[in-house]
């Protein structure tokens, strides 16, 4: 007896009890998405988004997402959710992106923002916690960005992670784990993983300079002759004679000896002092707030530039459960990726057929025009 198949949606429902889903967006309620997503008005020239499944798709409704609509524009849009901290938890960021226009230069990445981000004024200078996703420009840049904000600086992964460059929908997943390991997946397949400390070159941030520090006056010039440099110095070995009488002889002073051989411009002997090297100590800040932990995550958004528009963003997910993310990816992108390619193949065949028919028509017209010219030539020759 064959085992009964459990639908993917049922698996996802079961996982909800175990997973914390901070944000999930599939754009299945038509134009109501506008109540959740906020266009930035920071610049009147920002491009606009529309809800679309594109020219080819696996499912007309399920594949609808935010599509860029204007060429050579910056775009800025975001959605809020209940703020949370990923301290001590796994953080998964996942979404699909489709460069239907065959991207030549532009971003396809997303950003996670602090809860206090100003959505109406979102722009390229707005602070973000994480930037993740594909970026394409010409032949040189075809990369997956993974940028983390730490200690008021942005740190990029030092590894080169190649993105997909075709016009189909692809599933991008970033996993940040509390043991300071990470994983990047495309279409459910792991393409890069490793240590957050080493792959972001953050090991130096695990230690900080000790505040106590250099000897007093260390940074003052100590080599050159001082202004009070004298030719003579007191004889420290001299002692007052036993028959010295202060009442008659006055106050006794040690004899002054000449510094041999003194010349103007002579530099006194001393110890060369290099730059003071601070001792290194463990950065106590990191014990409370680690390299991939963010205290107040509260918004997700698209802030990017595109030369040629047409990209579609869909199936956004932010959660703490890797299995839930995997099942969600299968239930969304996994269900429509095949039909999408089938529709594209059908359209391609139709385009080829149409082009062939047009070529045949052109050839027939060309033959007729050729005969017409020959007839005219014949008549002209007859005239002679």
Swiss-Prot record:
Disulfide bonds join 105-137. InterPro entries: Calret/calnex, Calret/calnex_CS, Calreticulin, Calreticulin/calnexin_P_dom_sf, ConA-like_dom_sf. PROSITE patterns: CALRETICULIN_1, CALRETICULIN_2. Residues 1-19 form the signal peptide. Residues 250-284 are annotated as: 3 X approximate repeats. Pfam families: Calreticulin (PF00262). Residues 198-294 are annotated as: P-domain. Residues 20-197 are annotated as: N-domain. GO terms for biological process: cell differentiation; ERAD pathway; protein folding; spermatogenesis. One of its GO terms (molecular function) is calcium ion binding. GO terms for cellular component: endoplasmic reticulum lumen; endoplasmic reticulum membrane. A motif (Prevents secretion from ER) lies at residues 381-384. The keyword Metal-binding applies. Glycans are attached at residue 42. Sequence repeats lie at residues 191-202, 209-220, 222-231, 235-246, 250-260, 264-272, 274-284. It is found in: Endoplasmic reticulum lumen. Residues 295-384 are annotated as: C-domain. Keywords: Chaperone, Differentiation, Disulfide bond, Endoplasmic reticulum, Glycoprotein, Lectin, Metal-binding, Repeat, Signal, Spermatogenesis, Zinc. Belongs to the calreticulin family. During spermatogenesis, may act as a lectin-independent chaperone for specific client proteins such as ADAM3. CALR3 capacity for calcium-binding may be absent or much lower than that of CALR. Required for sperm fertility. Component of an EIF2 complex at least composed of CELF1/CUGBP1, CALR, CALR3, EIF2S1, EIF2S2, HSP90B1 and HSPA5. Can be divided into a N-terminal globular domain, a proline-rich P-domain forming an elongated arm-like structure and a C-terminal acidic domain. The P-domain binds one molecule of calcium with high affinity, whereas the acidic C-domain binds multiple calcium ions with low affinity. This is Calreticulin-3. It comes from Bos taurus.
């Amino acid at each position: 007896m064959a085992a009964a198949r459990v639908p993917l949606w049922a698996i996802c429902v079961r996982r909800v009890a175990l997973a914390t889903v901070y944000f999930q967006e599939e754009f299945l309620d038509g134009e109501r998405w506008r109540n959740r997503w906020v266009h930035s008005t920071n610049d009147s020239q920002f491009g606009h988004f529309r809800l679309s499944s594109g020219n080819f798709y696996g499912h007309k409704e399920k594949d609808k997402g935010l599509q860029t609509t204007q060429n050579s524009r910056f775009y800025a849009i975001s959605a809020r959710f209940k703020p949370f901290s990923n301290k001590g938890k796994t953080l998964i960021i996942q979404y699909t992106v489709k460069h239907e226009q065959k991207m030549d230069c532009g971003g396809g990445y997303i950003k996670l923002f602090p809860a206090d981000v100003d959505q109406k004024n979102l722009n390229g200078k707005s602070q973000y916690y994480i930037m993740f996703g594909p970026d394409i420009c010409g032949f040189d840049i075809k990369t997956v960005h993974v940028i983390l904000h730490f200690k008021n600086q942005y740190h990029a992964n030092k590894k080169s992670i190649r993105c997909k460059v075709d016009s189909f929908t692809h599933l991008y997943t970033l996993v940040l784990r509390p043991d300071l390991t990470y994983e990047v997946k495309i279409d459910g397949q792991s393409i890069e993983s490793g240590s957050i400390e080493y792959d972001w070159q953050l090991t130096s941030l695990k230690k900080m300079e000790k505040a106590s520090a250099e000897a007093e006056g260390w940074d003052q010039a100590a080599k050159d002759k001082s202004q009070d440099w004298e030719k003579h110095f007191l004889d420290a070995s001299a002692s007052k004679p036993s028959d010295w009488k202060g009442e008659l002889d006055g106050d006794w002073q040690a004899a002054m000896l000449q510094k041999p051989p003194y010349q103007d411009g002579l530099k006194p002997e001393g110890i060369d002092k290099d730059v003071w090297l601070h001792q290194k100590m463990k950065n106590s800040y990191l014990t409370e707030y680690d390299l991939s932990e963010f205290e107040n995550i509260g918004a997700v958004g698209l802030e990017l530039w595109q030369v040629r528009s047409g990209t579609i963003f869909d199936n956004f997910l932010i959660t703490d459960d890797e299995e839930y993310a995997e099942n969600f990816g299968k239930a969304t992108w996994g269900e429509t990726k095949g039909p999408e390619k089938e529709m594209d193949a059908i359209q391609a065949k139709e385009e080829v057929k149409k082009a062939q028919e047009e070529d045949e028509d052109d050839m027939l017209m060309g033959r007729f025009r050729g005969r017409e010219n020959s007839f005219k030539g014949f008549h002209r020759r007859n005239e002679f």
